[in-house]
C-alpha cells in the first residue's frame, strides 16, 4: 500500500493536536423553535376551522332566528286581531225568532247573555256548528273572538269540504252552503 499523504491541500503537515469533533447542535433551542412552530400551526388550524364552521353555521343560525321572530310576530298579530271584521259578521245568516222554531229544540237561552229567545228577536245561526244566539250578543262576541261561544269552532261564512272547496275555487266559483232560513 502506498504511503498516505497526510498533508492538507495547503501543504501544511497535519497538526499533532487531536482534532475536535464538530460542535453539537443546540438541541434545546431547536426543540423550543419546533414547539413554537407546532403550536402556531395548531392555533392557525383552529382559527381556520372556526372560520369554516362560522361560514356554515351562521346562515343556519340567522335563518332560524328569522323564522322564530316571524312566528312570534304572526302569533302576536293573531292574538291582537283574533276577532272577525264587522263586514264579515254582517254577512252571517240571521233570522227573526218565532216560537214554533226548529232552533228552540237545541237551545232555549242565548249562552252569551243568558236571556231566553223571544218572538220577533233577531238571531244568528252560525254556519258550521249551527249554534243560535241573539244577533247583538253574538255580533259583539265575534268582533272580539272568531270562534263559536259554545263549541269554539272557527266561524266561517261558507261551509266547505276542504278538498271540494279548493276545487270550486279553482274554477272561479264560490260554492255556498249557507243554511236556508
UniProtKB/Swiss-Prot annotation:
Catalyzed chemical reaction(s): S-ubiquitinyl-[E2 ubiquitin-conjugating enzyme]-L-cysteine + [acceptor protein]-L-lysine = [E2 ubiquitin-conjugating enzyme]-L-cysteine + N(6)-ubiquitinyl-[acceptor protein]-L-lysine
A Pfam family this chain is assigned to: zf-RING_2
TM region positions: 32-52
Compositionally skewed regions (Pro residues) per UniProt: 15-24
Molecular function in Gene Ontology: transferase activity; zinc ion binding
GO (cellular component) term, any one: membrane
Positions of region (Disordered): 1-24
Zn finger (RING-type) start-end: 110-152
Domain of life: Eukaryota
Biological processes per GO annotation: cellular response to hypoxia; protein ubiquitination
Membrane protein topology class: Single-pass membrane protein
Pathway(s) of this molecule: Protein modification; protein ubiquitination
Keyword Transmembrane: yes
SMART domains (UniProt xref): RING
UniProt EC number: 2.3.2.27
Keywords: Membrane, Metal-binding, Transferase, Transmembrane, Transmembrane helix, Ubl conjugation pathway, Zinc, Zinc-finger
Keyword Zinc-finger attached: yes
Leading EC class: transferase
Comment on protein domains: The RING-type zinc finger domain mediates binding to an E2 ubiquitin-conjugating enzyme.
The protein, known as: RING-H2 finger protein ATL56
Organism, scientific name: Arabidopsis thaliana (Mouse-ear cress)
Higher taxonomy: Eukaryota, Viridiplantae, Streptophyta, Embryophyta, Tracheophyta
Gene name per UniProt: ATL56
Amino acid at each position: 500500500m502506498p504511503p498516505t499523504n497526510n498533508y492538507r491541500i495547503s501543504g501544511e503537515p497535519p497538526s499533532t493536536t487531536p482534532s475536535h469533533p464538530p460542535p453539537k447542535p443546540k438541541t434545546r433551542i431547536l426543540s423550543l423553535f419546533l414547539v413554537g412552530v407546532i403550536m402556531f400551526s395548531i392555533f392557525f388550524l383552529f382559527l381556520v376551522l372556526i372560520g369554516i364552521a362560522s361560514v356554515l353555521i351562521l346562515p343556519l343560525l340567522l335563518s332560524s332566528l328569522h323564522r322564530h321572530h316571524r312566528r312570534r310576530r304572526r302569533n302576536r298579530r293573531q292574538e291582537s286581531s283574533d276577532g272577525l271584521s264587522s263586514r264579515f259578521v254582517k254577512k252571517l245568516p240571521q233570522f227573526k225568532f218565532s216560537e214554533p222554531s226548529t232552533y228552540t229544540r237545541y237551545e232555549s237561552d242565548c249562552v252569551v247573555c243568558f236571556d231566553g229567545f223571544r218572538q220577533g228577536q233577531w238571531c244568528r245561526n252560525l254556519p258550521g256548528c249551527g249554534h243560535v244566539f241573539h244577533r247583538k250578543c253574538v255580533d259583539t262576541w265575534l268582533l272580539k273572538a272568531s270562534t263559536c261561544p259554545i263549541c269554539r269552532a272557527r266561524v266561517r261564512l261558507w261551509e266547505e269540504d276542504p278538498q271540494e272547496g279548493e276545487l270550486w275555487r279553482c274554477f272561479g266559483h264560490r260554492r255556498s252552503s249557507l243554511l236556508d232560513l
